[in-house]
């Protein structure tokens, strides 16, 4: 199947993507973002196409076992006209990227040292995960989690109610 994998639903997925849903984020400076993701999150750059006039047209990085696509908004906006980086949206974003990691505490330290803003320090949560919420220098929100325990639905609801 030439590098392709069939998902559970029979859809062919190019082998490098591993999942049917592949987030694609827009940033003001993709080269700097890739460097930050490498230093902060241990990401690996797998693919990159630079635009003829400068900037990154398209890049793919591996974060854990998942792929994230990204590119410079200034390069892509001429084509689609509707892409925007968080800064163009007043600093907000409607998407958070959740990533499970073996040690959320060490990741939080490394990410903060690399320039991430810690919005919520590592905290044991009612849903059974230790979680940190970070904002990267491009304005995207990341939630990193270390799974601590499986929590049955009834217990999850009880804990949520008790938390107020």
Which residues does each predicted region cover?
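Hydrophobic ligand-binding cavity/cleft-lining segments
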Residues: 28-31
């Amino acid at each position: 199947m030439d590098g392709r994998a069939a998902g559970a639903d029979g859809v062919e997925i190019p082998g490098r993507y591993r999942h049917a849903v592949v987030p694609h984020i827009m940033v003001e400076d993709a080269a700097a973002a890739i460097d930050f993701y490498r230093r902060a999150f241990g990401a690996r750059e797998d693919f990159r196409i630079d635009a003829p006039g400068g900037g990154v047209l398209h890049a793919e990085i591996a974060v854990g076992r998942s792929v994230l696509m990204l590119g410079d908004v200034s390069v892509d906006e001429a084509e689609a006209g509707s892409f925007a980086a968080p800064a163009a949206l007043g600093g907000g974003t409607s998407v958070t990227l959740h990533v499970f990691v073996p040690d959320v505490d060490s990741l939080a330290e490394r990410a903060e040292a690399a320039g991430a803003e810690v919005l919520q320090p590592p905290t044991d949560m009612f849903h059974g995960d230790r979680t940190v919420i970070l904002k990267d220098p491009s304005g995207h929100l990341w939630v990193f989690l270390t799974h601590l325990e499986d929590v049955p639905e009834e217990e999850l609801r009880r804990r949520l109610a008790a938390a107020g």
